Amino acid sequence: MKVRRQVLGDEYVDAALASVTPLTKGLQDLIAEFVWGAIWTRPQLPLKTRSLINLGMLTALNRPAELKLHIRGALNNGCSREEIAEALLQSAGYCGVPAAIDGFRVAREVFESYQPEQQ
């Protein structure tokens, strides 16, 4: 949970946990234990690199809500706006220009509203 909070911020994680229902509990457990507990905590890649990888995958999958969340996470992990833009540009060559255009739209929204959480 520590890494999840570090990347996504306390406010987001608290809201996600507060919204758990009996229907979504299994999914939330999977996310907490597997994605954030087993994957993000591995020492082989720094969090910044993991964030940039996620941006490419979420752009390719056309998942704007998750992309928005993970652009914020990338900023929290120390990625510059230029690095994020470069990751989105890289996705244009492999995922297609329309996917990258949507990714840049999402990035612009995040950049305009991003306020680092006080740690």
Would you name each region that the model predicts?
Residues 31-35, 52-59, 87-92:
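Short alpha-helical scaffolding segments that buttress acidic/His motifs in well-ordered protein cores
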Residues 82-86, 102-105:
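A glycine-rich phosphate/pyrophosphate-binding beta-strand-loop-alpha-helix module
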Residues 1-48, 76, 102-119:
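Acidic, glycine/proline-rich low-complexity segments that act as flexible tails and inter-domain linkers
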Residues 52-55, 59-85:
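Mid-chain, well-packed structural core segment of small domains
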Residues 7-10, 64, 78, 94:
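Residues at alpha-helix boundaries and the short loops/turns that link adjacent helices
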Residues 73-77, 90-93, 109:
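Short basic/hydrophobic patches in alpha-helices and adjacent helix-turn junctions
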